[in-house]
Amino acid sequence: MQIEEIQNYPANLPVLVEDELFLYPFMITPIFINDSSNMKALDLAIKNDSMLFVAPSKLENGRNFDEIYNCGVIGTIMRKVPLPDGRVKILFQGYAKGKIIEQISNKPLEAKIELIKEDFLEGTKKEALLEVLKEKVKNLANISHYFSPDLLRTIEEGFDASRICDLILNTVRIKKQVAYEFFVLTDLEQKLVKLIDLIAQEIEANKIQKEIKNKVHSRIDKVNKEYFLKEQLRQIQKELGSDTQKEDEVREYQKRLELKKKFMHEDAYKEIKKQIEKFERIHQDNSEASMIQTYIETALDIPFEKISKKKLDIKEVSKQLNHDHYALNKPKERIEEYFAVRELLEKRKIAEKDGAKVILCLYGPPGVGKTSLANSVSKALKRELIRIALGGLEDVNELRGHRRTYIGAMPGRITQGLIEAKQINPVIVLDEIDKLNRSFRGDPSAVLLEILDPEQNSKFRDYYLNFNIDLSKVIFIATANDISNIPAPLRDRMEFIELSSYTPSEKFHIMKKYLIPDELKKHGLKSNELSIDDETIELIISDYTRESGVRNLRRKVAELCRKSAKKLLLENIKKVIINTKNLNEFLDKKVFEIEKNNGENQVGQVNGLAWTSVGGDVLKVEAVKIKGKGELTLTGSLGDVMKESARIAFSMIKVLIDEGKIKIPKKIIIDPKVNVYDSYNIHIHVPDGATPKDGPSAGITISTAIASIFSDKKVKADVAMTGEIDLKGKVLPIGGLKEKLIAAYKADIKTALIPRKNYERDLKDIPSEVRDNMEIIAVDTFSDVLEYTLV
């Protein structure tokens, strides 16, 4: 069949299937045939002396019409060569694109083929698109190996847009489906635009591939260089003998581990041994080597084998507590009881987990001696004291340790404390346990449950170490300011010992016996170089500090010592004498001063007693009546609970007025037809308005102030009171009684009214100097209060 016969289409042609490529017209392509279907199609074409239609397959080895594309190339067989392996090689030259319009036969494949004719494109648009395409191909050729110089020259010199497209598509690597889409596209303008876009994508892809290859080659070169340098360094170290350093370290670690073996859990021994073996195998230049070495040294620093051999001795503990602390009789007594039990358990070889399970928690205001009591215990037992501050702690890993997968991982504070103490049975103070925070990082109180529980703490697991540590020999003492903030499960496992405020007398003795000698020593002064008389000490306590403890008092003593030291050196004198007359030369002006009772009885002004975080205080409550409609106004930064107490008090007073238990003078009555309390607005004020105040204990104080203004009777100025009130006039118990009565004593109050339940329950805890110098009266109802207060 001659090429001129290509015009006699549609025509029936044998169909040969090509698995690998899309063939294009005007190209000579070798095709290898090794299956019977293609062999039969080839034989049919040769037999009929006809052209052959070559179609690409959709699926590998697809030989049915539904497994091949319906388009392909019409061409002739230029040569047929049998191969030794049984295959046949032919050279195929394509002439035109065609598509299957009718299936004639399946064995062999034969179909009616129709020519694919592309649209005609001429003019400037064709020239412009060809120029852009040729430029893109040139750019792609510069960064890839797709185009040979001859092919690139053919494309640059060509003018047949359709043929140039076929040459490019035959050269670049594209998927069969993409090639098919180009093959059947007859709009030449659209084909050029689409091909330009394809070449642009290929350019970008090749740039990225080239960049990645360059980086990979650069990295490989760097790695090879590092390896070469490390090998050189290793040989140098070997010549210098430094290569043996690691071997010495490994031997030292193994020796230390064997010495500690019988004192640690089996899992601890296995884990440390495993890490030593890993460290021995790993190259010292490996980044993991330093992490493993840090772990080994940390684990071996834990003092498994070191334990204080000092036996528990209750007499030593008692002696030390009394030597270091004045007063605090109840806390000291309870601590002595705790260690008496531990001593018996130890002597009779009873495991603590089988005995009394108690964790002591010392609570009270700042500066009252919570931590110093624990310090005295550690001295008596000859054990190290480790303080772990829990204030603001919200990450459980701070206690349990960080897993070694994290950068900067370290053991928890408990483990660090043992390492710092250099003994496995120190005294650990868990300071400010009431200030733990719960967050998304976990609940530290849950970890503390495990640490403090005798049934669990013998196998406490630190995440960093990944083995168990025995904490059963550690003495834990917790401290807190407000036990209501401690989580309930943790609170349930503790026994609380309250350290309440010091009285002025106790502070006087503490300052004279402990603070002044201690600060003199710290400031390099001798006892005969500074003199402070008793009256001055009392003045400093009452007017220069205001706290439950003695921390600020110590600061004042330190200030006196500093200024005395300066005075001794500058003025060349032998002794500094501080008294009430020259005290203001050494300390600033008075900061605190409890308002003394002035002895003037007034209507509507009552002395209340309040509790604050720094001790007790005398709180004035003032009330006035103004013509109005029975409204109640409250000022003085009062909290919700205190406001409710005022409303309860007002309602209770109304009932007493209606019942005739509070007599109203005629001069106060505005309209006999209207209740007197509906004729006035009541304004209650608590001075020092910038300070927030709250709580129910001012109930009887507010009630007395209202009763005073309606009865027009004065309130005794030397009487103070505290107690909650209910609507029936019953006086209910309150808290903080000791601090409140101490404040009343400081203010020269002669009589204090307190709820009867507090009188029966708490009076024994009130210092004798307060009880002996002030009349303390128990009240049951508000009628009792009026009996002792109104003049």
UniProtKB/Swiss-Prot annotation:
Question: What is known about its induction?
Answer: By heat shock.
Q: Which reaction does it catalyse?
A: Hydrolysis of proteins in presence of ATP
Q: Name one GO cellular component term.
A: cytoplasm
GO terms (molecular function) for this protein are: ATP binding; ATP hydrolysis activity; ATP-dependent peptidase activity; sequence-specific DNA binding; serine-type endopeptidase activity
Q: Does the record carry Protease as a key word? A: yes
Q: What Gene3D superfamilies does the database record attribute to this sequence?
A: 1.10.8.60, 1.20.5.5270, 1.20.58.1480, 3.30.230.10, LON domain-like, P-loop containing nucleotide triphosphate hydrolases
Q: Name one GO biological process term.
A: cellular response to heat
**Catalytic center residues:** 697, 740
Keyword terms? ATP-binding, Cytoplasm, Hydrolase, Nucleotide-binding, Protease, Serine protease, Stress response
Q: Which residues form the Lon N-terminal domain?
A: 13-203
Q: Extract the SMART domains matched here.
A: AAA, LON
- Provide the primary localization: cytoplasm
Q: Where on the tree of life does the source sit, at the highest rank?
A: Bacteria
Q: Which residues bind ATP?
A: 364-371
Q: Which segments constitute the Lon proteolytic domain?
A: 600-791
Q: What is its EC number?
A: 3.4.21.53
| CDD domains in UniProt | RecA-like_Lon
The record's subunit annotation is: Homohexamer. Organized in a ring with a central cavity.
- What family does this belong to? Belongs to the peptidase S16 family.
**What protein am I looking at?**
Lon protease
Please tell me the species this chain comes from. Answer: Campylobacter jejuni subsp. jejuni serotype O:2 (strain ATCC 700819 / NCTC 11168)
